Amino acid sequence: MKDYQQAAKVLRDTNLRQGLYDEGAVLMEGVLVNLHGEKHRARRGLENKVFRRGFFSHYEKDVFPKTLALTIDQFVSNGGGDLVEFGFRALINLTCDFAGVDRPQASQSETDRLLSLMRAFALGTTLAHSKDDRDKVRQQVSEALSAFDVEFLQPSVERRMSLIRQVEARGGEEQDLPRDVLTVLLRNEDQIELDGAQLVREMAFFVVAGAQTSIHSLVHVMHEIFTWSDNRSERIETLRTDPMLVQRCVHESARLHPSSPVAVRRAECPVLLPTEQRVETDEQVTIDLQSANQDEKIFGSRASEFDPNRQFDKGISPYGLSFGLGMHACIGRTLAAGVTPKPDTDPVDHQYGIIALIASALLKNGVRPDPEQPAEVDAKTERPNWGRYPVLLGSNPSSNPH
């Protein structure tokens, strides 16, 4: 299915359940994005308690800038490096914060360990598109889950359970507890079906989903920015001083490069699709997100081109269907991509999203592709992602980032 409006209707159809992650059940079985119906509503309702109004603004304006400054200062002092690796390091601590995974050592070696586990989890989320031996990948993911449970999750659970007992004993309030997904799940475990193994998968999924998608989005948008600004000094200077333009670049790149090029749904019962095709129970429907996001009826005759100044009809998201619709719309979309600005939006108070914040920081530090080291696509997956993207930072004899 490639038509934008038809794809949007299918994504909203509650008789079609998530089907993209069936192959990666070793990690994805029973996690939020794979639940359907009442179980999904119950779990999402709880986890939405973390992502209340003000949460995204707090993280974007108060928490993330400190983490980003530490990471980018090291990147600048090194004169650059691999943009993919930088993205992982910039985002891993943030995602652990809102997931509820403690890092008591706050050390380089601890971050390295988390990153190695997260990369293994990422193989589980993309198993349907893997080019490697899938049984070996499943074993690798399973071993990473066990290590994550022992090294990080159980200590985090024990600390939160102790805090929960203390707060409940003195009649305290919810605001006295950590504001993260793990705390919410532990406080409400009697309301949902979530055994020990399932909790490990849920937390691992939050860690990888929060970082991996944003990392790939970051590298894609920087590549698009490098291409769009090539030999145009006025564009480069505007990008360095106009965060609204950078956010539009993020949205436009997300439209062209959804984290998964397709969405998959399975029918819970017989369904008549917008194409007038009938789908029987348990049959699969594939939505071509990449094509739908480039539907010329919606995005114009040059829909396949990168244009951060593109105009949209009312009701059309600038990032297309890349963050999903309906019950499986991305729970962290506002954190990643910010809020779509209105004509009267105040740039000072606006939520740009962490991808735009990182991109702006890189641009202000003179980021540009490393001419001696070409970027490489990720050969381990069929997804069109960058596996390595060397860049330079700091002083540049030319004002051009390309």
PLM features: what roles do these ranges have?
Residues 1-24:
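N-terminal membrane-proximal hinge/A-helix region immediately C-terminal to the signal-anchor transmembrane segment
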Residues 288-318, 323:
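Conserved cytochrome P450 K-helix/beta-meander segment immediately N-terminal to the heme-binding cysteine loop
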